[in-house]
Amino acid sequence: MKITKLPSYRQTALIIFAGCVGLILAALYMQEVLGLHPCPLCITQRIFIIGVGLISLIAAIHNPAALGRKVYGCLATLSGVIGAGVSARHVWLQNLPEDQVPACGPDLAYMFDAFPLLDALKLLFAGDGNCADVVASFLGLSIPGWTFVAFVGLIAISVWQGLRKA
């Protein structure tokens, strides 16, 4: 039996980047073609997916030595963990009983125009009634559920990238 060689650090970083691009393209397809408008938590999840992707792209371009790999791995993992937390909150909101769903709030542009930055960020991460709607599901998981699964995968690969020797 022949043992195949694992992808290099740079190749794996590019695979992570490509995966993040694919996730964002899927989100844009759902928004623009299917007409599924993103709620504030959806947009927040996109931001953290973009964060993981950009960190991985920079890591691929830089192709650092051991310490740099740990730094990039930690940064990508941090972005992934925060994104997974936002996804988990989103799934939690979607599974609340109807009488406990928070009221619908303002849209994202209004939040950042009308409120100080920290207050707008608190509102953004809290989510609102718009975030509780399940607009589509596949194999029993809503879009935020699948995003959570994607974040778990990105976190696992990012941790491995930070810990790998070669």
Swiss-Prot record:
**Physiological role:** Required for disulfide bond formation in some periplasmic proteins. Acts by oxidizing the DsbA protein.
Tell me the HAMAP family matching this sequence: DsbB (MF_00286)
The record's annotation in Pfam families points to: DsbB
Provide the species name: Saccharophagus degradans (strain 2-40 / ATCC 43961 / DSM 17024)
Q: Where are the transmembrane segments?
A: 13-29, 48-64, 71-88, 146-164
Keywords linked to the UniProt accession: Cell inner membrane, Cell membrane, Chaperone, Disulfide bond, Electron transport, Membrane, Oxidoreductase, Redox-active center, Transmembrane, Transmembrane helix, Transport
Topology check: give the Cytoplasmic ranges: 1-12, 65-70, 165-166
What is this protein identified as? Disulfide bond formation protein B
